[in-house]
């Protein structure tokens, strides 16, 4: 049974009504500093921690709860007679509930003007010590670190004469140890990223030790293949607009492959937000590769254009929009087999239409355009870490290397193709025109084979490549790849450049009479 609670929080959300409920249930309140002041101002009887310890807060508040009167009350096993005898001998009372938030270290170091001294002062010492003590003794102590836990714990207490079950206490203790581990990991990451000058702004993006924190969203029926076990974990602090922020409106549970493909689709379609090519963008993904990308004046037009690129591959694919999916788009999509459909929102009409296709998974995700801080790739015994491929080359950063200048419409098509190229597995060749992909060659070991594949895909879809723009994610190592795309119908090409045979490739472009641009930026994707 809970008789005494110690409250000390940096996040004051909900703490006053929670404390009032505890008081109404006859629970004694102990508190520290600002929390004690807030509770007293709201008419609650509260015992200051210094009154409990008979020792004043000191060292600017660095020492206030590190005392046997606190830790003895948290750690004593109620079912151990020798523990209870020791408490009686030293005049220590049990503390049955601990409500703690830690100093906001992550929020502090995220500030651009944060100094090393600011960071150090926001390393909590007493808080983690109390949390670990209470969580260790979870059979006797209820420990809360988040306002979201206040209501369910109160409800359980009211239903059980101020008692909380062992099951609940254990769940809360697990949450505490995960939280303190993440907290210490963030401190270690920050400190090991600093140089000898302790310059906050000059710290490395790649600390000497890297601690990652994720929380499990779901266990899956299987992984990439049925014989593989799998689970999905969410970043503790996902960026705005990340796939992990999805809200599933309907459909079966997401599979491992669904999530992997959905992420490719969502990241690709987000890159067209604000693009002058059209008000709406649609991306169709199959096996992590785009099989159709388009922009249009509406979601319906964008979808219809994207679908034309490769109707057969779109079967069972993942579709993403960067605008709301309305009824017109939903009506067209409902005629196709779709695994997952993603959009920032769905109209009521669209939801009604899709309700008849309950196996289709609908995901609603806020459209934020931020990129993940890091990209990761697991290798045997290690982890490759890099910044995301977030660079979008602007027109004024490009270099026209051919004798013929591109027309405005060719430039527009090349910019569109280049945006798509970043999301196609290497070697990547993409034909585009009028705000849509026409043929996509992905994942071939030679660039010329990707060029041939892209031409074949366009032909199979009945799409003309005459006058199209072509993008290559990396330089053409030989002129054969350029010859293939020009013979296929391309009138202009965009590529990074950088080959030892660039002069030969430029000469081939001039020989064919096409316009060619070097971006100076490569977009390998493996």
Swiss-Prot record:
Pathway in which the depicted protein is active: Purine metabolism; IMP biosynthesis via de novo pathway; 5-formamido-1-(5-phospho-D-ribosyl)imidazole-4-carboxamide from 5-amino-1-(5-phospho-D-ribosyl)imidazole-4-carboxamide (10-formyl THF route): step 1/1; Purine metabolism; IMP biosynthesis via de novo pathway; IMP from 5-formamido-1-(5-phospho-D-ribosyl)imidazole-4-carboxamide: step 1/1
Entry keyword annotation includes Transferase: yes
Chain ranges passing through the membrane: none
EC numbers for this chain: 2.1.2.3, 3.5.4.10
MGS-like domain mapped to chain residues: 1-145
Signal peptide boundaries: none
Domain notes: The IMP cyclohydrolase activity resides in the N-terminal region.
Family: Belongs to the PurH family.
HAMAP family the UniProt entry points to: PurH (MF_00139)
Protein name, UniProt field: Bifunctional purine biosynthesis protein PurH
Organism: Polynucleobacter necessarius subsp. necessarius (strain STIR1)
